[in-house]
């Protein structure tokens, strides 16, 4: 009971009892003990009774024993006494050193760094709960990691801080002087008058005003990104900087007029901050000090620098980038001296010591932030154009005997054997040439090596047989958009499992052998890059050509056996379309293949035999003997009008394709080839070193007496309704 009574007695102290105990009624005692003044203005600390419950507070006698006149304030005690940040005069929270509180410095620094790139800064509202919690933490003096907080939240809390300053930042006592200086007509006179009024502000107010106006100036210069120019900023933050003492008693119209005047004043201060406050802007001590906001100097700046998504759009960065710093953490030594001057002396001394404005320092910081270091954020990837140039450089198309691409030493083709050196996305379709079929892979060869002709023919034949077993569709190489290689190479055909394959009808075995050099090919009939390549070589020379007959990649070889034939023809027979090839074959009976005797006795065969003086017919044994002989040179090209004519026809006439009718039985039994002038190259399938039985038909075309040729074709005669599918080819 006694304990309860004593406890109640201590809780029933009122203001009069406390005044008698501490004996501090005079105004001088209040100045000597700032805690009492802070308690008078801060009701949340001084109240003894809460609405719902009572809070235990320190008794005033205990406080007075600690705050005796004989004892001085220590650093830690002063920090505890000045824990309250809001609703305090700047002269109290700044202290005798005239330095801004640490949280305010940190907030200004973050706003200076992130504000120009944040849309709606100072305009957008923040979460109310987060705002209250942050204010409580700052008021209590707890260490708060401001870097992790949203920029809009910091801007809202900073506006609350300005609103809570007694008599406002621009001082309500100087309201009439501010308005009088603003009403001057001449801009120079207006600036001088505003300078004089600014000098009348208390030193802490002037220090905070300079920092704030410079930050707002930086934000307004980047208004195309943050949508906040000087006018918008003045509307949002102006009423928190200057008001009248009795503004709440004003009418709505008077309040509106007052806000317009304050908005005009703040906007003019933002636009003319250098003319009014000078270019030597004192640097934030938080930027240069080692113990203030180190995360902004190192971790925050380095995170923004390494983040490839961060991009500063401040136009001031480009103008100030010439004096940029090497890294954001290495600051110049002169601003550090400036910060020391701020900590030890007043703003006048700081203006004399600081040789560099804060705008340049911040701009240099942002300039370094605008250059992301991709070593940390993402790998360095060359663009598609760079890949194209590098791969084209590594890929060498030689003019040697085999016409094989020889990769350079150390090139990417040697190390990436399993990788397709010509991906689809690297070679876009340009000027009639598109991507190479995805099934084709280039075999890597040693530099300077040339495969023998027999091995090359075997490789081509093997790839044809493999492709026949896989039955995977491939794009037509005769299309103007499907000729990528101007020179012929060795390919290994592979089937992609992810792509649907189309089953084609079984054709004769003549698909797998190396045909006559004058066999109809899509490259020549379409007038593609192959015929353009030969127009440069008027001198006959041995060459391997890539001929795709019904999708099979085969090797064509010339032969020097019948030089009389080459001399007999004054012009090289140009590439013919499908109609020209089968016109002679269907001369008398369209749609029905001629027999061997009829083809031998046809007018085209007799004409060729009479003019070229070649062998009319050859047996399989004679062809097998002739194909082992030396290869012949190609005859000269036909005139330009023949090439253009065939190209025109080739673009319109379809070639043999997918929809093929079954072969007639008598075609399957035919094993004789009608050859004119040249013999066939040696081919062999996989596991078949010998020549396969040839099943073909002899056909002749009569164009004129100078331009006629008996062509051997591996396809059966098409029906009339099958020519519409003739331009497609499949493997």
From Swiss-Prot:
Segments for region (Disordered): 288-421, 464-507, 641-662
Residues in Rho-GAP domain copies: 88-277
Domain of life: Eukaryota
Keywords from the named record: GTPase activation, Guanine-nucleotide releasing factor, Phosphoprotein
InterPro entries given in the database record: ARHGAP20-like_RhoGAP, Rho_GTPase_activation_prot, RhoGAP_dom
Cellular component GO terms, alphabetical: cytosol
MF (Gene Ontology): GTPase activator activity; guanyl-nucleotide exchange factor activity
Compositional bias ranges of the Polar residues kind: 299-311, 380-399
Biological process according to GO: regulation of Rho protein signal transduction; regulation of small GTPase mediated signal transduction; signal transduction
Site (Arginine finger): 123
Chain positions with Phosphoserine modification: 400
Function: May function as a GTPase-activating protein and may play important roles during T-cell activation.
Protein known as: T-cell activation Rho GTPase-activating protein
Native species: Homo sapiens
């Amino acid at each position: 009971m006694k304990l309860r009574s004593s406890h109640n007695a201590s809780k029933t102290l009122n203001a009069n009892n406390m005044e008698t105990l501490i004996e501090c009624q005079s105004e001088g005692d209040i100045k000597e003990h700032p805690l009492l003044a802070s308690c008078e203005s801060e009701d949340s600390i001084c109240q003894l009774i809460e609405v719902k419950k009572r809070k235990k507070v320190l008794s005033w006698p205990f406080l007075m024993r600690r705050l005796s006149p004989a004892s001085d304030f220590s650093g830690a005690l002063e920090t505890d006494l000045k824990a309250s940040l809001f609703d305090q005069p700047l002269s109290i929270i700044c202290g005798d050193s005239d330095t801004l509180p640490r949280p305010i410095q940190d907030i200004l620094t973050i706003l200076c760094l992130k504000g120009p790139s944040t849309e709606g800064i100072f305009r957008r509202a923040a979460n109310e709960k987060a705002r209250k919690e942050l204010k409580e933490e700052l008021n209590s003096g707890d260490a708060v990691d401001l870097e992790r907080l949203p920029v809009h939240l910091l801007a809202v809390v900073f506006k609350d801080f300005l609103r809570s300053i007694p008599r406002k930042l621009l001082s309500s006592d100087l309201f009439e002087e501010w308005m009088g200086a603003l009403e001057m007509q001449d801009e120079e006179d207006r600036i001088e008058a505003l300078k004089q009024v600014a000098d009348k502000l208390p030193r802490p107010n002037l220090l905070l005003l300079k920092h704030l106006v410079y930050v707002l100036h930086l934000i307004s210069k980047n208004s195309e990104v943050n949508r906040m120019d000087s006018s918008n900023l003045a509307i949002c933050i102006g009423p928190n900087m200057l008001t009248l003492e009795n503004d709440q008693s004003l009418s709505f119209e008077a309040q509106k007029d007052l806000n317009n005047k304050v908005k005009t004043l703040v906007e003019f201060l933002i636009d003319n901050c250098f003319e009014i406050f000078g270019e030597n802007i004192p640097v934030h001590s938080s930027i240069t000090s080692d113990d203030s906001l180190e995360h902004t100097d190192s971790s925050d700046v380095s995170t923004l620098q390494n983040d490839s998504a961060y991009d500063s759009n401040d136009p001031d960065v480009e103008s100030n980038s010439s004096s940029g710093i090497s890294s954001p953490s290495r600051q110049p030594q002169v601003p550090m001296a400036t910060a020391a001057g701020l900590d030890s002396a007043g703003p006048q001394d700081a203006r004399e010591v600081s040789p560099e404005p804060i705008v340049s320092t911040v701009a240099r910081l942002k300039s370094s932030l605008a250059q992301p270091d991709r070593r940390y954020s993402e790998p360095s990837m060359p663009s598609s154009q760079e890949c194209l140039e590098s791969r084209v450089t590594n890929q060498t198309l030689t003019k040697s005997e085999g016409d094989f691409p020889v990769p350079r030493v150390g090139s990417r083709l040697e190390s990436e054997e399993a990788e397709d050196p010509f991906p689809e996305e690297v070679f876009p379709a340009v000027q009639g040439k598109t991507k190479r079929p995805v099934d084709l892979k280039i075999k890597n060869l040693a530099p300077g090596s040339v495969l023998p002709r027999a091995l090359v023919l075997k490789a081509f034949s093997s790839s044809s047989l493999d492709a026949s077993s896989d039955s995977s569709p491939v794009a037509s190489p005769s299309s103007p958009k499907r000729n990528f290689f101007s020179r012929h190479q060795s390919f290994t055909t592979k089937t992609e499992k992810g792509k649907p394959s189309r089953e084609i009808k079984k054709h004769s075995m003549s698909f797998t052998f190396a045909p006559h050099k004058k066999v109809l090919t899509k490259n020549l009939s379409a007038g593609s890059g192959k015929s353009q390549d030969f127009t440069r070589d008027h001198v006959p020379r041995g060459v391997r050509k890539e001929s795709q007959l019904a999708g099979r990649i085969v090797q064509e070889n010339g032969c020097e056996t019948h030089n009389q034939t080459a001399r007999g023809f004054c012009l090289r027979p140009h590439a013919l379309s499908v109609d020209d090839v089968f016109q002679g074959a269907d001369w008398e009976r369209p749609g029905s293949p001629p027999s061997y005797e009829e083809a031998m006795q046809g007018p085209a065969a007799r004409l060729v035999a009479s003019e070229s003086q070649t062998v009319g017919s050859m047996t399989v044994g004679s062809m097998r003997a002739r194909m082992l002989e030396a290869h012949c040179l190609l005859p000269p090209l036909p005139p330009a009008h023949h090439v253009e004519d065939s190209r025109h026809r080739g673009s319109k006439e379809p070639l043999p394709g997918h929809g093929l009718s079954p072969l007639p039985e008598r075609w399957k039994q035919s094993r004789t080839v009608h050859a004119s002038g040249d013999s066939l190259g040696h081919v062999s399938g996989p596991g078949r070193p010998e020549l396969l039985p040839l099943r073909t038909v002899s056909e002749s075309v009569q164009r004129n007496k100078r331009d006629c040729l008996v062509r051997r074709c591996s396809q059966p005669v098409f029906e009339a309704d099958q020519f519409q599918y003739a331009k497609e080819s499949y493997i």
